[in-house]
Design a protein with these regions (language model features):
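Short amphipathic alpha-helical segments
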Residues: 2, 25-33, 59
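C-terminal helix-cap and adjacent tail motif
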Residues: 4-8, 13-14, 91, 153-181
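A short N-terminal beta-strand-loop micro-motif at the entrance of redox/enzyme domains
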Residues: 14-30
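Glycine/small-residue-rich phosphate/adenosyl-binding loop
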Residues: 27, 43-110
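Short beta-strand segments
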Residues: 33, 38-39, 45-50, 116
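Small-aliphatic-rich amphipathic alpha-helix that forms the alpha element of a beta-alpha
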Residues: 35-36, 83, 89, 98-142
Length: 181
């Protein structure tokens, strides 16, 4: 448990990458394997990962991710890899469960697989950042994603040039209770 807590504590959202240093295919493969073994409601695995490492296409995806008006996400241009997470249709059991319980289990599952992915990246000593703010229509068009599919996340990965920073978290007493709220 000590090793896992160390890994989780070390992982941060990195927003500065070495654009000249590519991510090794072997590392990327292990990261994707870790993401694919994440648990999901009724084992539906409602995700598809599109790995963008072609420099020209990556820059076009980064353009769709950054916002000039708000000054957001310009760092995505530096990242050598973008992993787009596309929501797939859940299996019948998970879909019915989502409807009955009024919870989108697919979105929860994608959050879990994203956590696996970024922790695996950290274990490979790679920086990552989960980006949810992007022009989904542009991304869908760039990557030939069918119109009925949702692109939920763009996870950028690369060798971080950002220094480690201390975690700012609420005190455990604020977020944990036992037996009652």
């Amino acid at each position: 448990m000590k090793d896992f807590l160390s890994l989780a504590s070390r992982r941060q959202s990195d927003r500065a990458f070495d654009p000249q240093r590519p991510v090794e295919k072997e590392k990327l493969q292990r990261i994707l394997e870790a993401a694919c073994i994440a648990p999901s409601a009724c084992n539906s695995q409602p995700w598809h990962f599109i790995v963008v490492d072609d420099p020209e296409l990556k820059n076009r995806v980064a353009d769709a991710t950054s916002n000039r008006v708000l000054g957001m996400n310009h760092f995505t241009k530096q990242a050598p890899v973008h992993i787009l997470v596309v929501e797939e249709r859940p299996n019948l059991t998970a879909g019915i469960g989502s409807w009955i319980k009024d919870k989108n289990f697919s979105h929860l599952d994608i959050g879990i697989t994203a956590a696996h992915l970024v922790l695996a990246a950290e274990d490979e000593r790679l920086g990552s950042c989960i980006v949810g703010w992007f022009d989904e229509t542009k991304v869908r068009k760039l990557l030939d994603i069918p119109s009925g599919k949702r692109v939920l996340l763009d996870i950028v990965i690369g060798y971080s040039t950002q220094p480690d920073r201390p975690k700012k978290r609420k005190d455990l007493k604020e977020v944990i209770s036992y037996n009652r709220y």
